[in-house]
Amino acid sequence: MALNKPKIVILGAGYGGLMTVTRLTKYVGPNDADITLVNKHNYHYETTWMHEASAGTLHHDRCRYQIKDVINQSRVNFVQDTVKAIKIDEKKVVLANGELQYDYLVIGLGAVPETFGIKGLKEYAFPIANINTSRLLREHIELQFATYNTEAEKRPDRLTIVVGGAGFTGIEFLGELAARVPELCKEYDVDRSLVRIICVEAAPTVLPGFDPELVDYAVHYLEENGVEFKIGTAVQECTPEGVRVGKKDEEPEQIKSQTVVWAAGVRGHPIVEEAGFENMRGRVKVNPDLRAPGHDNVFILGDSSLFMNEDTERPYPPTAQIAMQQGITVAKNLGRLIKGGELEEFKPDIKGTVASLGEHNAVGVVYGRKLKGTPASFMKKVIDNRSLFMIGGLGLTLKKGKFKFF
């Protein structure tokens, strides 16, 4: 048996971190290394389902599962704690309740909302970020509807929901919200015509980078279901009363709203910046083998990493699909570092992208084919189920998966 086995520490049980730890035991034997996984919760949550939990169309418990249920507990030491700092020079991770030494480090700490310095967003807008923020947003929206008819003087701002951002998360949330609002109106005796859902997007288009035909389909569907779009319009300030928005060279508009949702981008975790890695908005431009430049014992993946697409000379978007593929590569490369062997370069295999528009509608491109409506919605559920299967097998898929296809 090897003495002084190398210590592998994996930070974060998101898509990338969990994929690394579940695959690592295939490439590293019990006598080769000690494996520790650190996560602040005892559960993993499906980040790509948070728009559903936030709107209240899917219960938050359906969006998470216990980490101990999917890891090999005889091989992996799970530490539930919060990462406070990474000391690269000392090969040490500082936790809220202690410290961990490492020989090899995997950083998969995920993302935090990017507010671009817009005044009041952090204080007054609701992000779509995790189980806690989703639960809060869902309950807040329900409270506005419940309160509306109890007040002698009716307040339209309670029934006005502003969504900042018409990218992937924003559009998926709007799709769920459009489906949820009629249910809330029925439950709380509110006339649907009194409810306003307003999407504000600074870019000149909805779903940047998506096929224009699919964008038109998504916008038309959402408008039919009561969503108003203000495109080429930036959120300038968020206040307790609502938001100030405006186009360039035009007079700003005040929108009174008790519910402002911010879905316009994320940045890498601040701990990655504070650790001293060269980064862009908290994301480290990693080497082809997913190691941090200048740090041969540190791998970075998921939202914490920036991996360039050589064809477009732009970074790949930080998706769950890529994070999981990175996790497999990191697991293989850790095995090769410990046992000897040439490290593998990460090659993303983009199978497609699908944006949901509620439970039974979606738009996307899969294997080069454009999909919309029911076929796209079917594929979205297949993709969601596949991520469960890859980490937790058939048991987890049957327990948490989505099978209401039509």
Curated annotation (Swiss-Prot):
One of the Pfam families matching this protein, by short name: Pyr_redox_2
EC number(s) recorded for this UniProt protein: 1.6.-.-
Cofactor note text: Binds 1 FAD per subunit.
Keywords: FAD, Flavoprotein, Oxidoreductase
BP terms from Gene Ontology: aerobic electron transport chain
Cofactors (names): FAD
Oxidoreductase as UniProt keyword: yes
Molecular function terms from GO: NAD(P)H dehydrogenase (quinone) activity
Tagged with keyword Transcription regulation: no
InterPro entries: FAD/NAD-bd_sf, FAD/NAD-binding_dom, NADH-Q_oxidoreductase
Family note: Belongs to the NADH dehydrogenase family.
Protein name per Swiss-Prot or TrEMBL: NADH dehydrogenase-like protein YumB
Organism the protein comes from: Bacillus subtilis (strain 168)
Phylogenetic classification of the source organism: Bacteria, Bacillati, Bacillota, Bacilli, Bacillales
